């Protein structure tokens, strides 16, 4: 499991790595989190998102086993595997057996990716069995090279299952290792590792740079190292042996910004992990060159720290062990919240891993945005705030987020949020991210993470959750805590993971665009179990992803940064900035989260504040909103409002997010959470930009509100709390959107049923009372990413409905005209009645249907929506005119009343009139006038041949004949065609035609 998770971690983020670890732990500790309810056991994840500089090596080690156990078994694997995976980056041979053993997946980023995936799944099961500790770092590290960021993200998304595998494929070593790392971290002794991670975060940061040096290979290793061994080892382990900086690493760049700083401190690569920082770090540290070196260095460090753990593993192996050890140490020492810290560290390592990967593959930005990939329809507890974040990050990274972006996903999506919006549009979808929405860059990481999670977690989309969590943990302490918790929660609520991706993911179905896509993929890969739990979370996550996605987790940040660069357009500079900030927050969050719910709350507040600022976040928030809409079941909206007040800094969306989140947790509990959520929103937006400062300031506020709900919520709830923060962000937009939907609801009423359904869902979101149930439904509903597409669809439908309305109105006017004409017409009251009833009842289409040809009616109706109605009506009108001509003579007769004789003698009188009116149709008129039957036929032909007066001539002939059939036809025609009546009308017709 650990290795599995480690892999995810690696892929996702060093930060996430830690989270992943926690997540893994959650999986193992089914008891802790029942929300996810993995197949065997509900993954119980106590996510302690640790935001720290991404360690070059993120090592996931079971707290107990660390790296010591090389066996594929979850515990053993995680530390050793993580290290090894990272090592494997540069030293695939390790991957051979050790990799499989440790991380089977991590070791061979590319080759082993599949293996890792399998192992991961296997491990996930094992892990569940192991259930080392509640705490698992569910850190999602998405490592993408600055240039290949999106690409990597995409790959990751595709390969998301393996977690690192996707990236591994792209940057096999880096991604795989990253994944491993993350997995390991997650899996590691989630608790021990987490603790270490806490301390480790800074170290991790240091490691991250090293990792970057190690590039793909190094990255995972570093990540692993960081995650596992977090403390100094991480830093030293990382690519930069020169930065042995346990201190530096520990210090890391305080989070991304901080993280960045931490990362930079550690090895530049660390910073790069944030995206920008990662890049910088990567650049700073010879990432590509040191790819192998990085791994090696990391390993050496790892060896130092955990040499005992896996000396044979090679430097890499030992390194992981060391990393685990260090991580523990660091976590404990570095962060008081060792719990939160360790997740954070875990996260960090993944981030680092991501960084490394980024470097090697140009993965510089390992930005893990929690995309709420809400890929899984299953209700996830919003609590997977972090997941959401991750998804978002993914989306953001991929640009899916840019939706957000699932789809994002939300995202998502919503390409992350169509795929990722659906997953994506991730997704995600899109996330879409979302992102994930949505969110592709992150998406891959998220994907990877999710994969790890998934496999470990069995439940679908645990990764996403992880990612989200990681992202969530944007605040150094709080952020991390959140991420961790979220991650754990994600794992706990596999559904949540599924939910995402946006965002993120993201979510997956729709989830944030890119993110969602990735997230969705992840979710899909993840077993349904996770989906159930995570779906709701996912939705929330997606929201979070959107809102938090940007910066959510340090890793997320890294990715975000990277993505920022790539998706800078999308997210804008803020995203990178956010990302930078976020890592710190994440670390804090992780620490807080791990430590206690209260910490988490504090983290939330920090994150929230941090989250608040980023415009990119705003984007995400919008996505989140959508995600929330999906979550709409959640009664967060009202809560969100309260939340909003709490986090005045946070966007209104934050409150919304919060509200989304709340529903996830329990409404009662969630409400308290809401406040925290409001605070937490910083995770999404503010987190990245001013994650640290804000997170600190927010922490106090957040803590008090969150603490109460958090505790009630339980581990899962705690995560949920975090999630709510992310959700609150996304909810805000959602609320806005909900309002919009409500505004549009009138139109929607006329829209197709699907639109109505969406409306109902949105309403549910708006109504907190309904939110809870709806949130469950939302789980089933498409992620945010889907929502985006859904929104588009709804808008289109609404537009069509409006058009139809207008057309109907015009038709009704025509109908009234027809009736008017009917009376005017000499035809009997029967005829008049018929036209009136038919047109009114059926409307234009019905009129046409009443006409001899239903096909024309159908075509007309079809055309009506497009606005092609006129062309069709022209044909219909022609037919109508023919038939109407029969009774039209009456209107003409009025005009021709002067010549009643002429009227009788249609041939003589009518021709002149028609001639005057329509010279072209004179000839046509003549034949109809001459013989009723023939004229009728002719009139039909005439009708076929467009002629406004065709019907006139026909009407004259009909009138002469007084054929009941013709009259009936005329009545029908009249009904269908308003133009039948008067010369004026005819003029109109001619104009129309």
Curated annotation (Swiss-Prot):
It is found in: Nucleus; Nucleus envelope; Nucleus, PML body; Cytoplasm, Cytosol. GO terms for cellular component: cytosol; nuclear envelope; nuclear lumen; nucleus; PML body; sarcolemma. Transmembrane segments: none annotated. The keyword Metal-binding does not apply. Residues 564-574 have a biased composition (Basic and acidic residues). Residues 343-358, 533-563, 811-822 have a biased composition (Low complexity). Predominantly expressed in the heart and skeletal muscle. Also detected in liver. One of its GO terms (molecular function) is transcription corepressor activity. Disulfide bonds: none annotated. InterPro entries: MLIP. Pfam families: MLIP. The modification Phosphoserine is found at residues 146, 818. Residues 161-837 are annotated as: Required for interaction with ISL1. One of its GO terms (biological process) is negative regulation of transcription by RNA polymerase II. It is a peripheral membrane protein. Residues 71-90, 152-171, 186-225, 231-250, 300-322, 334-358, 443-481, 500-582, 677-711, 811-864 are annotated as: Disordered. Residues 80-90, 212-225, 300-315, 500-532, 695-711, 849-864 have a biased composition (Polar residues). Residues 1-51 are annotated as: Interaction with LMNA. Keywords: Cell membrane, Cytoplasm, Disease variant, Membrane, Nucleus, Phosphoprotein. It is uncertain whether Met-1 or Met-18 is the initiator. Directly interacts with LMNA. Interacts with ISL1 (via N-terminal domain); the interaction represses ISL1 transactivator activity. Interactions of ISL1 with MLIP1 and GCN5/KAT2A may be mutually exclusive. Required for myoblast differentiation into myotubes, possibly acting as a transcriptional regulator of the myogenic program. Required for cardiac adaptation to stress through integrated regulation of the AKT/mTOR pathways and FOXO1. Regulates cardiac homeostasis and plays a role in the protection against cardiac hypertrophy. Binds chromatin. May act as a transcriptional cofactor for ISL1, repressing its transcriptional activity. May also repress MYOCD transcriptional activity. It is linked to Myopathy with myalgia, increased serum creatine kinase, and with or without episodic rhabdomyolysis 1: An autosomal recessive muscular disorder characterized by mild muscle weakness, early fatigue after mild to moderate physical exertion, exercise-induced muscle pain, variable susceptibility to episodes of rhabdomyolysis, and elevated serum creatine kinase levels. Rarely, affected individuals may demonstrate cardiac involvement, including left ventricular dysfunction or rhythm abnormalities. This is Muscular LMNA-interacting protein.
